[in-house]
């Protein structure tokens, strides 16, 4: 499939057009027509009904639902994707409520500040959906995508969506969506690309605390951050001037290595070496909650069980059903942007960290190698990192 940029999609939406939004392969793997309520007209709904053929819904943010007292359709929501339907509605000035014009009228009433809760008949022919707070950064659904896109166009947080079905009634996927796009001259994007776009252009980290932190390796300032879309807590330790290509280490949390000094890995030794380097040369260490390359502590221990049976650190992850590396560095990039940093010298042997930061607009000016001694217990691990994961060691 050929996808368009988010910028082109935003422009199309501002022009009153519908676009196609495709979700992930491991989710519904389907495409929805999406339009912004503020920019659409009767033709939008008519096109969705005639060509899309799916259920026409009206994603809105929580504040609109609360203001208009739109209650959940079902208190015990058992939908496998957690789609938050409210009771269906018709605006009181409609007749049957089903025509393209009248569904447009109902959708427009949702964003009219003069609309009152009693202005809707319930049930009706339009199905509002409540988006999760923080949109696709919290839930990668079409509901959240529509509301996020509405905001990105500068409109009120409301849209209309409709699943795309084939002529035979099956759901359009893959090449079917590509043909639909070409036939109707529509822009098409993925929710994944929308997530990446938002992470690249928005600042979603919040400084919660800053303290002096004396350590065995020097005296630092420690900053504590949270994000708008998860319960993660991230710390950054800083020393010296950060203005010109500061030295930065992105360190993934490793309880076994950092705290218990496990010799199965080189994590603890790398953290200590990084702290010594930053103490001497200045810079920052961003400590990321990415235990086990993102699989979590217990799964990392399960991987260790497999390693004891002859697997390596890559094949163990794969055997457990994970990719070899699940880490994403957008939070680190956002923390750097919080400090107005866009160019860094990176302390790392891992090329994926270079790519991960560059994907979010951070330029790597220079690489500072971080070589620590091997132990009798981590030789195989280090060889796997070098030969299978491309680490520069």
Swiss-Prot record:
Pfam families: DHBP_synthase, GTP_cyclohydro2
Coiled-coil stretches noted in the UniProt entry, renumbered to this chain: none
Binding sites annotated in the UniProt record for Mg(2+) 1: 28
Annotated binding of Mg(2+) 2, by residue: 28, 142
GO biological process: riboflavin biosynthetic process
Site feature Essential for DHBP synthase activity, where: 125, 163
Keyword Phosphoprotein attached: no
Stretches the record annotates as GTP cyclohydrolase II: 201-393
Binding site for GTP: 249-253, 270, 291-293, 313, 348, 353
Cofactor: record remark: Binds 2 divalent metal cations per subunit. Magnesium or manganese. Binds 1 zinc ion per subunit.
Residue positions binding Zn(2+): 254, 265, 267
Cellular compartments per GO CC: cytosol
Region (DHBP synthase), start-end ranges: 1-200
Residues annotated as binding D-ribulose 5-phosphate: 27-28, 32, 139-143, 163
HAMAP family referenced in this protein's UniProt entry, alphabetically: RibA, RibB, RibBA
Stated family: In the N-terminal section; belongs to the DHBP synthase family.
Job description of the protein: Catalyzes the conversion of D-ribulose 5-phosphate to formate and 3,4-dihydroxy-2-butanone 4-phosphate. Catalyzes the conversion of GTP to 2,5-diamino-6-ribosylamino-4(3H)-pyrimidinone 5'-phosphate (DARP), formate and pyrophosphate.
Name of the protein in its database record: Riboflavin biosynthesis protein RibBA
Naturally occurring in which organism (per UniProt): Staphylococcus epidermidis (strain ATCC 35984 / DSM 28319 / BCRC 17069 / CCUG 31568 / BM 3577 / RP62A)
Gene name per UniProt: ribBA
């Amino acid at each position: 499939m050929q996808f368009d940029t988010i910028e082109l999609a935003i422009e199309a939406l501002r022009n009153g057009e519908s676009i196609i939004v495709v979700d992930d392969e491991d989710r519904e793997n389907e495409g929805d027509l999406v339009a912004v309520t503020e920019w659409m007209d009767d033709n939008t709904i008519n096109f969705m009904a005639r060509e899309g053929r799916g259920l026409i819904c009206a994603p809105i943010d929580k504040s609109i639902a609360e203001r208009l007292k739109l209650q959940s359709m079902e208190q015990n929501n058992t939908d496998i994707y957690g789609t938050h339907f409210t009771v269906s509605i018709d605006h009181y000035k409609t007749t049957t409520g089903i025509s393209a014009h009248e569904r447009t009228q109902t959708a427009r009433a949702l964003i009219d500040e003069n609309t009152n809760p009693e202005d809707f008949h319930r049930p009706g022919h339009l199905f509002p959906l409540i988006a999760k707070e923080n949109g696709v950064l919290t839930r990668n659904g079409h509901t959240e995508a529509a509301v996020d896109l509405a905001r990105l166009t500068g409109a009120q947080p409301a849209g209309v969506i409709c699943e795309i079905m084939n002529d035979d009634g099956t759901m359009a996927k893959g090449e079917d969506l590509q043909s639909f796009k070409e036939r109707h001259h529509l822009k098409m994007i993925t929710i994944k690309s929308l997530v990446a776009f938002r992470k690249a252009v928005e600042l979603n980290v919040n400084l919660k605390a800053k303290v002096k932190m004396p350590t065995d390796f020097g005296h630092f300032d420690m900053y504590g951050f949270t994000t708008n879309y998860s319960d993660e807590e991230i710390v950054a330790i800083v020393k010296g001037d950060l203005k010109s290509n500061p030295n930065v280490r992105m360190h993934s949390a490793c309880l076994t290595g950092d705290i218990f000094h496990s010799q199965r890995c080189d994590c603890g030794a790398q953290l200590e070496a990084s702290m010594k380097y930053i103490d001497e040369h200045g810079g920052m260490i961003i400590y990321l909650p990415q235990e086990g390359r993102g699989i979590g502590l217990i799964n990392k221990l399960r991987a260790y069980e497999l390693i004891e049976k002859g697997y390596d650190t890559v094949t163990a992850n794969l055997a457990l059903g994970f990719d070899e590396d699940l880490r994403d560095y957008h939070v680190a990039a956002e923390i750097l942007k919080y400090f107005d940093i866009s160019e860094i010298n990176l302390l790392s042997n891992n090329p994926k960290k270079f790519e991960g930061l560059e994907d979010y607009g951070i330029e790597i000016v220079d690489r500072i190698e971080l070589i620590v001694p091997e132990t009798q217990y981590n030789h195989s691990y280090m060889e796997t990192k070098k030969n299978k994961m491309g680490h520069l060691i």
